[in-house]
Amino acid sequence: MSILAEKLSSILKRYDELTALLSSAEVVSDIKKLTELSKEQSSIEEISIASKEYLSVLENIKENKELLEDKELSELAKEELKILEIQKSDLETAIKQLLIPKDPNDDKNIYLELRAGTGGDEAGIFVGDLFKAYCRYADLKKWKVEIVSSSENSVGGYKEIIALIKGKGVYSRLKFEAGTHRVQRVPETESQGRIHTSAITVAIMPEVDDVEVSINPSDLKIEVFRAGGHGGQCVNTTDSAVRITHLPTNISVSMQDEKSQHKNKDKALKILKARLYEKQIEEQQLANAKDRKEQVGSGDRSERIRTYNYPQNRLSEHRINLTLYSLEEIMLSGNLDEVINPLIAHAQSQFE
């Protein structure tokens, strides 16, 4: 028996064990255990179905090879073997995909955070441009985008944008966008035609619930203040703006987009939880990195992952040495799959 067949046999054995356990009186009476085992069985159900089919094909191949010695049935066996070998190959491809460890966050909604970095006003303008590209991509995927918070600069760009993106598989598609995005282009205000380089950071934070991230209220410092408008002018006569700081990590979130202090506090707390969860993910990825052949990226905001060179119409994805000369088309159409699909394929290949 091949190594793959042995692995699949052990998965089937475990699936059958779980079926027996889930019908036992001891487990049925224990809600926690029942939920835990049901979740485990559900996670291997798809691979179990494929495993049964694959092992059945292997058995049929073995039987037909034996029939090759039979003069009357050899021709029929040869034809059958051709079909079976194709089935075997197709199943092996599908099974390899199913054996790739699932990211537990892949089905989650996300908080997308874009911040202007080096480059002044031009960085802020690119925050808006990249956010529009993400919105177009979300539209193509039938996702819903809700701006949670935004801070504009004086030239129509943004210091920061935070948005909640909801839909099927949002995190699985956008998780590799985290990091530093560098843009090279001639600003509209540049009379000499010189190319400016600026950078923005992107953070991708899974939306989490209270069970996944528990915060001790005593670890929070909550401050309220009056919301300020553009240029710092006061736009609210009540203390509706909120700043929440998580003291153990010094992670801070400010929110003033809503007129209600309660709503601002609720939004700030949700983003704070997402940032704390993101921090947990980063720490886990760093701990697991040595067990992987290579990482697509740590998700660290300081890691320069991509360059957008407008004069050359070039998009360079540094983590996988991918270069595309269709930058403007990608940004205008929002078809980020040209970059995202190769990143996902590369990440999956590290588990093969």
Swiss-Prot record:
Secreted is among the record's keywords: no
Positions of region (Disordered): 288-309
Top-level taxon in the UniProt lineage: Bacteria
InterPro entries, per database record: PCRF (IPR005139), Pep_chain_release_fac_I (IPR000352), Pep_chain_release_fac_I_sf (IPR045853), Prokaryotic/Mito_RF (IPR050057), RF-1 (IPR004373)
Cell compartment(s), UniProt: Cytoplasm
GO molecular function: translation release factor activity, codon specific
Gene3D superfamilies hit by this protein: 3.30.160.20, 3.30.70.1660, 6.10.140.1950
Annotated signal sequence range: none
Annotated TM spans: none
GO-annotated cellular components: cytoplasm
A Pfam family it matches: PCRF
Primary location: cytoplasm
Post-translational modifications reported in the UniProt record: Methylated by PrmC. Methylation increases the termination efficiency of RF1.
Entry keyword set: Cytoplasm, Methylation, Protein biosynthesis
Residues bearing the modification N5-methylglutamine: Q233
Annotated Basic and acidic residues bias: 289-306
Keyword Cell inner membrane: no
Recorded family membership: Belongs to the prokaryotic/mitochondrial release factor family.
Function: Peptide chain release factor 1 directs the termination of translation in response to the peptide chain termination codons UAG and UAA.
Protein name: Peptide chain release factor 1
Natural source organism: Helicobacter pylori (strain ATCC 700392 / 26695) (Campylobacter pylori)
Gene name for this UniProt entry: prfA
